[in-house]
From Swiss-Prot:
Known cofactor(s): Zn(2+)
Cofactor note: Binds 1 zinc ion per subunit.
Protein name: Threonine--tRNA ligase
Enzyme class, broadest EC rank: ligase
Family matches, as CDD domains: TGS_ThrRS, ThrRS_anticodon, ThrRS_core
Family: Belongs to the class-II aminoacyl-tRNA synthetase family.
Region Catalytic, annotated ranges: 242-533
Protein source organism: Polynucleobacter necessarius subsp. necessarius (strain STIR1)
Amino acid sequence: MLVVTLPDGSKREFEAPVRVADVAQSIGSGLAKAALGGIVDGKMVDTSFVIDKDSQLAIITDKSPEALEIVRHSTAHLLAYAVKELFPEAQVTIGPVIENGFYYDFSYHRPFTPDDLVALEKKMTELAKRDEPVTRTVMPRDEAVEFFKKQGENYKAELIASIPQGEDVSLYAEGKFTDLCRGPHVPSTGKLKVFKLMKLAGAYWRGDSKNEMLQRIYGTTWLRKEDQDAYLHMLEESEKRDHRRLGKQLDLFHFQEEAPGLIFWHPKGWSIWQEVEQYMRRVYQQEGYQEVKAPQILDRGLWEKSGHWENYKENMFTTESENRAYALKPMNCPGHVQIYNSGLHSYRELPLRFGEFGQCHRNEPSGALHGLMRVRGFTQDDGHIFCTEDQIQSEVAAFDKAVRAVYQDFGFTEVAVKLALRPAKRVGDDAIWDKAEEALRGALKASGQEWEELPGEGAFYGPKIEYHLKDSIGRTWQCGTIQVDFSMPARLGAEYVAENNSRKTPVMLHRAIVGSLERFIGILIENHTGNMPVWLAPTQAVVLNISGNSAAYAQQVQQLLKKQGFRIESDLRNEKITYKIREYALQKTPFLLIVGDKESESNTVAVRARGGVDLGVMPLDAFVARLQQDISQKVGPEPS
């Protein structure tokens, strides 16, 4: 008798091996119809999977968290099926699941067009409506190579040939189309109801620029139409908020070919930068950090000692001078250890906290560069804490408190915490990593935090806590980190004198709150759609005169406000006031101060807040009070 145990603890007995679909049918016809797959003893499988021993089983339906992966994987195959139907000469390559959807790469003699996407989506809908069964077969590797060669699918044959000899491979067929895949897949194409093809792109075969350029089709798939509609709406909002477009519209920064991945900051953009930097400098001071500055270029020998040369060389810019090899720093930590090592330290001095607005350079692939979000040159609010093992928890707890206060001030209230654990490529032995990971777990527990663990995602020198911010349209951004490092201080000879006069190696905590200032400013721009809070706005108010008669008073108002430390401009052009109002509204200026004869005579200003909100006529002192309040509270005015 074969026993299948269900998630609620109930058991089903069967006299012979049984398919997942049959177990679902034994529970109820509704569940059988809804089944998309199963989880047998922790492994995701098709509904056709045969259970031949006592097992635990969970049926995957559209209510299961695993459902989207199966549906998206199956939709990628549906796309490939449609391509082969409409373009029989196209060759299929790979089609993985990615965040929010999938892509599939094809080789074809001409570029696909937007019209082709429309036709392909229509064909996919037609194939889905046929509700053709999706069947799995297993084939020896060599037989599978010949199978795909006969079909003219040379890329698939090459992929399978790279699998070790003697291994079997699984194939999935729907209608006339067969593809290589580990699975699992939906039981039939009729389960695929909500999908959309999104865009076209190029991609090299196997990611190697020496190989053929393939055509990549991106798509998205969802279990419910309302989920897809929400996702598409979010994409529309993302387009409106694109910091690259807003950076140009608001005259904040630009990029050019002569400096790929590097930013030309304009006065208004640099004003935002300065506000963020000065704010973070105050955080350094409040949290007991000493600000330092380390060199940009360091000898190769130091990078070899730190482990960067072995583990990070491909991302470093290198140069030579007088027969010595150097590298532009990709990280600030080795420089801070040198500052620490310049003197002898006692245990009484620990924790010792250094902070730097450290400019780093990383040789990112050109295809990965993306505005302010992915650059080759960036500045971090980078701090390093030298402490004892006993001080780790209290330092991490203090950092956690500070990081949340900072995010609150910048307008982010939803913060998720993740713990990134040891990667495959790392320095230090497992005992050191065990100690480091447990130290961070203990600190999170002591802080009362909930967290998600990310195996393999840590830095090469230590595990890290990551802070992920949710923005105003629901996207998440990883910004702050704190990492425990038992390895680098020892590699670079850092020591302190312990209470018993012995020499010990300090623990080093790497921490950043906003991370890359460039990226964080890009996030701020998109979060606020360019409507920066008053305290960050490059121009906090503009004085607009209605006619030449009030020009002198407009200048007087501007000067009075500037003397009080506000960022104020005036526009005295001989243009219609409606034209000037519209122009500065497009610039997303927080306040417009309109002055004419009446305002000049009464020493007042007519105030319009962002979004066309009329705040009426008020004495200048009253406007100053409003401005000071908004700045101190780090708020509005919000666009209507």
